[in-house]
Amino acid sequence: MKRRDFIKAAACVAAFASRCGSAAGAADERPLRGSTLPPAAEAVLFGGSAWKLHMYTGRTTDISLSTLFRSPSGRLVMIDGGWGADGEFLLGELKRFGGVVDTWFLTHAHRDHYRALGEILKKPRFGGLKIGRVVLDFLPLDFIAEVSPSSLQHVKEFLGDLAKSGLKVERPAVGRVYDFGEGLSFECLNSCDLSMRRDAINNSSICYRVMNAGSSILVTGDVGEEMGAKMVRELPREKLKSDVCFMAHHGQAGANKEFYAAVRPEACIWPTPQWLWDNDLAGENGPGSGPFLTNYTKCWMQELGVKRQFLLTRDWVLS
């Protein structure tokens, strides 16, 4: 979703987000807006023999999600990947770590999540990358044509490139566990619900509860309020409770406070650029000038007692 569309969507659900105390916005790192991208920061979050979690900020100023799990023996599992403009950087990173991706998960059919993979698929022999399988559950094309016609052509192009690639494609099922060994597993928690027509593509995000050497991580994609509420109603609490939570929809206008209260995370990962963190309209009008709800979410995390927050205005390596 482009920033202009993101702004339009945010304006439909709220006017201006209220300010919260500075403690709510405290994150492990906040580089100055406009500075050059600093080197990746590292932090110990899991410990022991855990897979490393590489969280990549976008190579543009737009919203995106790009996540890599890397095992002690060098195995790779990807989630999303970002925009097409992120593809070249991501390809280089994956090749730096051996160039063999066991599984590539895509959470939903928005370009800031799947387009980087699409660009890699266009390259001869995928730019030297080997991909074992792609796991996705996108909404049906005829449904996308009804609820988000501006997305249709982009999704069709990507699915066409994926079909031509010859890669193995799997559709996740609720309760399916993907066990990668070395202490890493992904459990699928939900499926698309065609009754959700408001914010339909975001609400189709497939969420995974990841176990990494005994630590639990909830991957939320861009899950919206409706799907988040359904998961709270229908899932046992132990399926949602997680040590670490990816903030849904880049930290605003996604899942609600009740969802995060059910998750009860100790640490949060914000796939949120600086302008969105600051609620800065167009990234140039100053903090608090935008229609975004980020500050509400910051307040919720403060009230829920979250201990650590990682802001993706830079790359992070969590081990």
Model-predicted segments: where are they?
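N-terminal export signals
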Residues: 5-27
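Metal-dependent catalytic neighborhoods of phosphoester/phosphodiester hydrolases
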Residues: 115-124, 145-152, 257-260
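Extracytoplasmic/secreted proteins, especially bacterial periplasmic and envelope-associated proteins
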Residues: 89, 115-119, 157, 230, ...
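Active-site environment of divalent metal-dependent phosphoester hydrolases
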Residues: 62-63, 84-86, 109-115, 141-144, ...
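Core dinuclear metal-dependent hydrolase active-site scaffold
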Residues: 29-99, 169-240, 316-319
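Active-site metal-binding motif and surrounding structural segment of the metallo-beta-lactamase
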Residues: 74, 84-136, 234-252, 264-269
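Binuclear metal-ion centers of metallo-dependent hydrolases, dominated by the metallo-beta-lactamase
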Residues: 133, 141-202, 267, 272-319
